[in-house]
Amino acid sequence: FVAAKACLKLGARVLVLNRPSDRFQKSLEVLKTENSNTEILPVDCDLQSFNSVRQAGRKIHELCPNGLDVLCNNAGVMALEDVPTEDSFDVQMQTNHLSHFLLTKLVFDLLEKSANLNGEARIINHSSIARKQVKKLEPKYLKKNGGNLGGNGSSIFFGGARWTRYGQTKLANAAFTACLHSKLSLKNSNIKALVAHPGFAITNLQSTTVKDGGMGKLF
Protein backbone atom coordinates (compact mmCIF):
# COMPACT_ATOMS: atom_id res chain seq x y z
CA PHE A 1 0.00 0.00 0.00
CA VAL A 2 2.70 2.49 1.01
CA ALA A 3 4.90 1.59 -1.96
CA ALA A 4 1.97 2.06 -4.34
CA LYS A 5 1.10 5.34 -2.65
CA ALA A 6 4.66 6.65 -3.07
CA CYS A 7 4.79 5.68 -6.75
CA LEU A 8 1.41 7.27 -7.45
CA LYS A 9 2.56 10.53 -5.89
CA LEU A 10 5.41 10.55 -8.40
CA GLY A 11 2.90 10.23 -11.23
CA ALA A 12 3.51 6.59 -12.03
CA ARG A 13 0.96 4.27 -13.57
CA VAL A 14 0.68 1.55 -10.94
CA LEU A 15 -0.53 -2.04 -11.16
CA VAL A 16 -1.44 -3.48 -7.76
CA LEU A 17 -1.52 -7.26 -7.43
CA ASN A 18 -3.56 -8.77 -4.63
CA ARG A 19 -6.15 -11.37 -3.75
CA PRO A 20 -9.71 -10.08 -4.08
CA SER A 21 -10.91 -9.01 -0.62
CA ASP A 22 -12.83 -6.27 1.15
CA ARG A 23 -9.59 -4.97 2.66
CA PHE A 24 -7.95 -4.73 -0.75
CA GLN A 25 -10.99 -2.98 -2.20
CA LYS A 26 -10.96 -0.41 0.61
CA SER A 27 -7.23 0.20 0.11
CA LEU A 28 -7.77 0.60 -3.61
CA GLU A 29 -10.49 3.19 -3.05
CA VAL A 30 -8.22 5.16 -0.71
CA LEU A 31 -5.42 5.16 -3.28
CA LYS A 32 -7.78 6.27 -6.04
CA THR A 33 -9.26 9.05 -3.89
CA GLU A 34 -5.86 10.40 -2.87
CA ASN A 35 -4.43 10.14 -6.38
CA SER A 36 -7.26 11.03 -8.73
CA ASN A 37 -4.93 12.28 -11.46
CA THR A 38 -2.94 9.06 -11.80
CA GLU A 39 -3.82 5.58 -12.98
CA ILE A 40 -3.99 2.60 -10.64
CA LEU A 41 -5.03 -0.79 -11.95
CA PRO A 42 -5.89 -3.84 -9.81
CA VAL A 43 -4.71 -7.27 -10.92
CA ASP A 44 -6.05 -10.38 -9.16
CA CYS A 45 -3.16 -12.48 -7.89
CA ASP A 46 -3.00 -15.06 -5.10
CA LEU A 47 0.64 -15.85 -4.39
CA GLN A 48 -0.38 -19.14 -2.78
CA SER A 49 -1.43 -20.40 -6.22
CA PHE A 50 0.96 -20.70 -9.17
CA ASN A 51 -2.04 -20.81 -11.48
CA SER A 52 -3.18 -17.43 -10.16
CA VAL A 53 0.32 -15.99 -10.61
CA ARG A 54 0.40 -17.18 -14.22
CA GLN A 55 -2.98 -15.56 -14.85
CA ALA A 56 -1.65 -12.33 -13.35
CA GLY A 57 1.39 -12.54 -15.61
CA ARG A 58 -0.86 -12.73 -18.66
CA LYS A 59 -2.92 -9.79 -17.40
CA ILE A 60 0.20 -7.66 -16.92
CA HIS A 61 1.17 -8.35 -20.52
CA GLU A 62 -2.25 -7.11 -21.62
CA LEU A 63 -1.96 -3.94 -19.55
CA CYS A 64 1.69 -3.16 -20.29
CA PRO A 65 2.38 -4.11 -23.92
CA ASN A 66 5.09 -1.44 -24.19
CA GLY A 67 7.06 -2.62 -21.18
CA LEU A 68 7.29 -2.57 -17.39
CA ASP A 69 9.61 -0.09 -15.67
CA VAL A 70 9.65 -1.52 -12.14
CA LEU A 71 8.61 -4.82 -10.57
CA CYS A 72 8.33 -4.60 -6.79
CA ASN A 73 7.98 -8.02 -5.14
CA ASN A 74 6.64 -6.76 -1.85
CA ALA A 75 4.06 -9.26 -0.56
CA GLY A 76 4.74 -11.57 2.34
CA VAL A 77 3.50 -13.65 5.25
CA MET A 78 5.38 -14.35 8.46
CA ALA A 79 5.71 -17.27 10.88
CA LEU A 80 2.56 -19.08 9.75
CA GLU A 81 1.68 -22.67 10.57
CA ASP A 82 3.33 -25.58 8.78
CA VAL A 83 0.75 -26.02 6.02
CA PRO A 84 1.00 -26.65 2.27
CA THR A 85 -0.37 -24.56 -0.56
CA GLU A 86 -2.50 -26.07 -3.33
CA ASP A 87 0.82 -26.62 -5.13
CA SER A 88 2.19 -28.60 -2.13
CA PHE A 89 4.89 -26.10 -1.18
CA ASP A 90 5.28 -24.45 2.23
CA VAL A 91 2.82 -21.57 2.47
CA GLN A 92 5.53 -19.12 3.53
CA MET A 93 8.08 -20.14 0.89
CA GLN A 94 5.56 -20.03 -1.94
CA THR A 95 4.07 -16.70 -0.88
CA ASN A 96 7.33 -14.95 -0.04
CA HIS A 97 9.70 -16.34 -2.66
CA LEU A 98 8.59 -18.96 -5.17
CA SER A 99 5.66 -16.98 -6.55
CA HIS A 100 7.80 -13.84 -6.74
CA PHE A 101 10.40 -15.84 -8.65
CA LEU A 102 7.71 -17.09 -11.03
CA LEU A 103 6.19 -13.64 -11.52
CA THR A 104 9.61 -12.18 -12.27
CA LYS A 105 10.16 -14.84 -14.92
CA LEU A 106 6.74 -14.24 -16.46
CA VAL A 107 7.18 -10.48 -16.90
CA PHE A 108 10.93 -10.40 -17.53
CA ASP A 109 10.42 -9.73 -21.23
CA LEU A 110 8.43 -6.60 -20.35
CA LEU A 111 11.24 -5.39 -18.10
CA GLU A 112 13.73 -5.97 -20.92
CA LYS A 113 11.52 -4.03 -23.29
CA SER A 114 11.34 -1.07 -20.91
CA ALA A 115 15.08 -1.19 -20.21
CA ASN A 116 15.83 -1.09 -23.93
CA LEU A 117 13.42 1.78 -24.51
CA ASN A 118 14.20 3.91 -21.47
CA GLY A 119 17.71 2.89 -20.47
CA GLU A 120 16.79 1.14 -17.22
CA ALA A 121 14.28 -1.12 -15.47
CA ARG A 122 14.31 -2.44 -11.92
CA ILE A 123 13.38 -5.56 -10.00
CA ILE A 124 13.03 -4.90 -6.27
CA ASN A 125 12.72 -7.78 -3.81
CA HIS A 126 11.91 -7.21 -0.15
CA SER A 127 13.89 -9.35 2.25
CA SER A 128 14.26 -9.01 6.03
CA ILE A 129 16.90 -9.09 8.72
CA ALA A 130 15.24 -12.38 9.67
CA ARG A 131 17.35 -14.02 6.95
CA LYS A 132 20.31 -13.79 9.33
CA GLN A 133 18.72 -16.29 11.71
CA VAL A 134 19.44 -19.13 9.25
CA LYS A 135 22.97 -20.07 8.17
CA LYS A 136 22.23 -21.28 4.66
CA LEU A 137 19.42 -22.14 2.28
CA GLU A 138 18.25 -25.71 2.72
CA PRO A 139 16.76 -27.45 -0.35
CA LYS A 140 13.97 -29.12 1.62
CA TYR A 141 12.29 -25.75 2.17
CA LEU A 142 12.18 -25.12 -1.58
CA LYS A 143 10.60 -28.46 -2.46
CA LYS A 144 7.06 -29.84 -2.24
CA ASN A 145 7.32 -30.48 1.49
CA GLY A 146 4.58 -28.17 2.72
CA GLY A 147 3.15 -29.42 6.00
CA ASN A 148 6.26 -31.50 6.76
CA LEU A 149 8.79 -28.86 7.70
CA GLY A 150 9.06 -28.97 11.46
CA GLY A 151 5.53 -28.29 12.61
CA ASN A 152 4.44 -25.14 14.41
CA GLY A 153 6.83 -25.12 17.35
CA SER A 154 7.46 -22.12 19.57
CA SER A 155 5.74 -18.77 19.17
CA ILE A 156 8.77 -16.93 20.58
CA PHE A 157 9.94 -14.17 18.22
CA PHE A 158 12.56 -15.63 15.83
CA GLY A 159 12.33 -18.99 17.62
CA GLY A 160 11.03 -22.38 16.52
CA ALA A 161 10.24 -24.07 13.22
CA ARG A 162 7.79 -21.52 11.86
CA TRP A 163 10.38 -18.74 12.25
CA THR A 164 13.05 -20.92 10.65
CA ARG A 165 10.78 -21.34 7.63
CA TYR A 166 10.28 -17.58 7.51
CA GLY A 167 14.03 -16.98 7.71
CA GLN A 168 14.55 -19.39 4.83
CA THR A 169 12.13 -17.40 2.67
CA LYS A 170 13.90 -14.14 3.41
CA LEU A 171 17.32 -15.64 2.70
CA ALA A 172 15.87 -16.99 -0.55
CA ASN A 173 14.82 -13.43 -1.48
CA ALA A 174 18.35 -12.15 -0.95
CA ALA A 175 20.04 -15.09 -2.69
CA PHE A 176 17.72 -14.82 -5.69
CA THR A 177 18.46 -11.11 -6.02
CA ALA A 178 22.22 -11.59 -5.74
CA CYS A 179 22.21 -14.35 -8.35
CA LEU A 180 19.96 -12.36 -10.69
CA HIS A 181 22.18 -9.28 -10.30
CA SER A 182 25.22 -11.35 -11.21
CA LYS A 183 23.59 -12.80 -14.32
CA LEU A 184 22.30 -9.41 -15.45
CA SER A 185 25.72 -7.84 -14.96
CA LEU A 186 27.37 -10.51 -17.10
CA LYS A 187 24.93 -9.66 -19.89
CA ASN A 188 25.51 -5.90 -19.45
CA SER A 189 21.77 -5.65 -18.98
CA ASN A 190 20.05 -2.37 -18.20
CA ILE A 191 17.86 -4.18 -15.68
CA LYS A 192 18.88 -3.69 -12.06
CA ALA A 193 18.06 -6.29 -9.40
CA LEU A 194 17.84 -4.81 -5.90
CA VAL A 195 17.01 -6.22 -2.47
CA ALA A 196 15.76 -4.18 0.48
CA HIS A 197 15.11 -4.69 4.17
CA PRO A 198 12.24 -2.28 4.92
CA GLY A 199 12.79 -2.32 8.66
CA PHE A 200 10.01 -2.46 11.22
CA ALA A 201 6.83 -0.93 9.87
CA ILE A 202 3.19 -0.57 10.85
CA THR A 203 1.50 -3.16 8.63
CA ASN A 204 -0.88 -6.08 8.97
CA LEU A 205 2.01 -8.54 8.64
CA GLN A 206 2.42 -8.92 12.40
CA SER A 207 -1.32 -9.07 13.09
CA THR A 208 -1.66 -12.01 10.71
CA THR A 209 1.21 -13.74 12.48
CA VAL A 210 -0.46 -13.22 15.86
CA LYS A 211 -3.78 -14.63 14.62
CA ASP A 212 -1.94 -17.69 13.35
CA GLY A 213 -0.22 -18.21 16.72
CA GLY A 214 3.27 -17.18 15.63
CA MET A 215 3.90 -14.34 18.10
CA GLY A 216 1.92 -15.38 21.14
CA LYS A 217 4.77 -14.80 23.60
CA LEU A 218 4.91 -11.11 22.72
CA PHE A 219 1.28 -10.38 23.63
Predicted segments — roles?
Residues 210-219:
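Terminal hydrophobic/aromatic helix or amphipathic segment near a protein terminus
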Residues 1-210:
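Rossmann-fold NAD(P)H-dependent dehydrogenase/reductase core
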